[in-house]
């Protein structure tokens, strides 16, 4: 994952010892993991869940604190009906987000699981799929 973030010139703090992390108030953990490792990773951990955004990368977040919950709170705060909201996603960590809005749009390169819950599918992210979708819908 360090190499992944280095691509965008982002610096990443890497904890060498998990005991050091437990001393801090942690809101999210990003780590490399495969689906077959999830159960072992969360063994003994209370109130957390894994959302995968790549087949080798996951976020560990508090239960009910994912993108969907965030969208719902924002819609409520600003008084926006979910039918008036849309979201784009490409990974399994976007499933709850797409379910929380009136129009959930999966990218062409999205996971099959995300496409299954999407209302629509637009072009690939590498081919400016969001831009072309917005052009087609006369949003821009």
Regions found by a protein language model. Name each.
Residues 1-88, 92-97:
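Conserved acidic, metal-coordinating active-site core of Asp-based
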Residues 55-58, 109-112, 126-130:
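Short, acidic/turn-prone active-site loops that include or flank metal/cofactor-
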Residues 60-64, 115-121, 131-134:
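Short, charged, surface-exposed secondary-structure boundary motifs
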Residues 70-73, 129, 133:
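Well-ordered alpha-helical segments embedded in enzymatic catalytic cores
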Residues 71, 81-118, 123-125:
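Acidic, Mg2+-coordinating phosphoryl-transfer loop and its flanking beta/alpha structural elements
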Residues 136-140:
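Generic C-terminal helix-cap and adjacent flexible tail
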């Amino acid at each position: 994952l360090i190499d992944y973030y280095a691509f965008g010139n982002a610096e990443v703090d890497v904890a060498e010892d998990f005991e050091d992390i437990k001393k801090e108030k942690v809101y999210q953990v990003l780590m490399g993991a495969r689906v077959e490792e999830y159960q072992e990773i969360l063994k003994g951990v209370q109130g957390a869940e894994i959302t995968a955004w790549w087949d080798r990368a996951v976020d560990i977040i508090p239960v009910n604190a994912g993108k969907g919950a965030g969208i719902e709170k924002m819609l409520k705060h600003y008084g926006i009906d979910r039918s008036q909201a849309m979201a784009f996603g490409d990974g399994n960590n976007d499933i709850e987000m797409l379910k929380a809005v009136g129009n959930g749009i999966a990218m062409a390169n999205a996971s099959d699981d995300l496409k299954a819950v999407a209302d629509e599918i637009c072009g690939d992210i590498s081919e400016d799929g969001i831009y072309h979708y917005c052009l087609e819908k006369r949003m821009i």
